[in-house]
Structures are given as structure tokens and as C-alpha cells.
Curated annotation (Swiss-Prot):
Source lineage: Eukaryota, Sar, Alveolata, Apicomplexa, Aconoidasida
Source organism: Theileria parva
Protein name: Small ribosomal subunit protein eS1
Repeat among keywords: no
Location of the protein in the cell: Cytoplasm
GO cellular component: cytosolic small ribosomal subunit
Length: 262
């Protein structure tokens, strides 16, 4: 027996329960703000670990990408087939200011457009907007039967597919290079670019259901807080204006009435 060792002293059990700490007690909620391009500005909340020492909570928020349905951002169920990606660029108080980071069409929508005996035509183009965003636009379209066509199939020749590819790329390049990112998003949401492609390709072969199925942000310009605040409508021009309320003819000044009565 070793000197100083007492067998009678009870030891702690190995399987003792540890103190349970709620993981959410170390986290806090931040509000997500969408740009003014969308109707719904507050589109959700996100969790982040609280600031501890030199590790700031804002560092864990910047760069986060959130994917939302366009139906929720615009309060329109008809736009549920399109998804929007928004990335957190800056944090103001408890609000995360986001910016456009891409868009895509749901698989259900693409599968619903595919038809038997019709040709599917795809194209993509790398473009640069006026405000310095490098984007890659993906377009998809389907052939359409000519008026009075008797043939059951509606396939297009490879030579015409090449011409349609060129038209798709040229239209997407012109629309994107002559507009800012905000203006481009406004064009993509109502599918105006797809309608322009249908008009341009009408002389080659009639198309239908042409849409920009995906936009990928390849490179963003240098971060500018002023432009971000403008996209969230924080400019000084939007301050409240004074309202002139016309006073009723029957209204009287109480002090004047008391002086007249005395």
C-alpha cells in the first residue's frame, strides 16, 4: 500500500452528468433587409454567435448568402418558380444589409416546360454591367409550332440553332451591358429579356417560354457603402417632408377666446 493513499476516500463517478449549457444562450438574432428592388424589405432573421473578445459577430455575418423565393420577396405567388440569392454586405445595428447575389429557376418549372417533339435551345453569355458586376447569364428556350403547321414534330435544324444561339447571346449582352445590376434585376423578374429574344429569333424560328433561367455573379466591384445604402433607400432624399394641414374654419384659439371674454 502506497504511503498517503486512503482507499476509504470516495472518488467521483466517471459517468457523472456534465452541466448542460443552452447553445442558443451564446447566440443572437439579426434582421435581414432586402434591397428596394423587392416589395418585402424584411424577409427573415439569422443567428450568429455573440461577440467574444476580438471575434466580432459582424464578421460571421458578412458574406453569408441567403436563398429566398421571389414569391416571398414580392408577395406574389405567381413568381414562386424563381429563387433569389442575397448576400450580406454590411451590418447596421441589428440589420443585415443584403445585395443581389444571383437567381435561378426551380427544377419543377424547367421540367414543366419540356415537351415531346419540341427542341430545347440553351445559351449563356458573360457580361459586365455599368456598375462593374461581372455576370454569367444562362438562357433557355423552346421551339414553337408555326401557324397552320400540319407536321406533328417541331424540331429545328442545327444551322438554325447556331443562329438562335448568336441572337440569344447578343440580346443578353446588350441588355446587361447597358444597364446597372438593379435595372437588370428589374428586367429579369418580368421576363422582358426572354420576350426580346423571342422577337429577335422570330425571323429564324418561332420560340416560346424563353427565360433567363440563371444568373451567376462572377465578380463584384470594390465594396462601396454609399451605393449599398442607396440600394436600401437610406439616402437623404427620402427624408420625411413637412405636411401643411389646413385648419378648420370653426377652430378657435383658446387663449384668444379667453382674452376676448375677459
Amino acid at each position: 500500500m502506497a504511503v498517503g493513499k486512503n482507499k476509504r476516500v470516495s472518488k467521483g463517478k466517471k459517468g457523472a452528468k456534465k452541466k448542460v449549457i443552452d447553445p442558443f444562450s451564446r447566440k443572437e438574432w439579426y434582421n435581414l433587409k432586402a434591397p428596394v428592388t423587392f416589395n418585402v424589405r424584411n424577409f427573415g432573421q439569422t443567428l450568429v454567435t455573440k461577440t467574444v473578445g476580438t471575434k466580432l459577430a459582424t464578421d460571421g455575418l458578412k458574406g453569408r448568402v441567403f436563398e429566398m423565393s421571389l414569391a416571398d420577396l414580392n408577395a406574389d405567388e405567381d413568381q414562386a418558380y424563381r429563387k433569389i440569392k442575397l448576400s450580406c454586405e454590411d451590418v447596421q445595428g441589428r440589420n443585415c444589409l443584403t445585395d443581389f447575389h444571383g437567381t435561378s429557376v426551380t427544377r419543377d418549372k424547367l421540367c414543366s416546360l419540356i415537351r415531346k417533339n419540341y427542341s430545347l435551345i440553351e445559351a449563356f453569355a458573360d457580361v459586365k454591367t455599368l456598375d462593374g458586376y461581372n455576370l454569367r447569364l444562362f438562357c433557355v428556350g423552346y421551339t414553337k409550332r408555326r401557324p397552320g403547321q400540319l407536321k406533328s414534330t417541331c424540331y429545328v435544324r442545327t444551322s438554325k440553332v447556331r443562329l438562335i444561339h448568336k441572337k440569344m447571346v447578343s440580346v443578353m449582352t446588350n441588355e446587361a451591358s447597358n444597364s446597372t445590376l438593379k435595372e437588370l434585376v428589374k428586367k429579369v423578374i418580368p421576363e422582358s429579356i426572354g420576350k426580346e429574344i423571342e422577337k429577335a429569333c422570330k425571323s429564324i424560328f418561332p420560340l416560346q417560354n424563353v427565360l433567363v433561367r440563371k444568373i451567376k455573379v462572377l465578380k463584384k466591384p470594390k465594396f462601396d457603402l454609399t451605393k449599398l445604402m442607396e440600394s436600401h433607400n437610406y439616402s437623404g432624399d427620402e427624408e420625411g417632408r413637412t405636411l401643411k394641414v389646413k385648419e378648420s374654419e370653426n377652430a378657435t384659439n383658446l387663449l384668444t377666446a379667453e382674452l376676448q371674454s375677459s
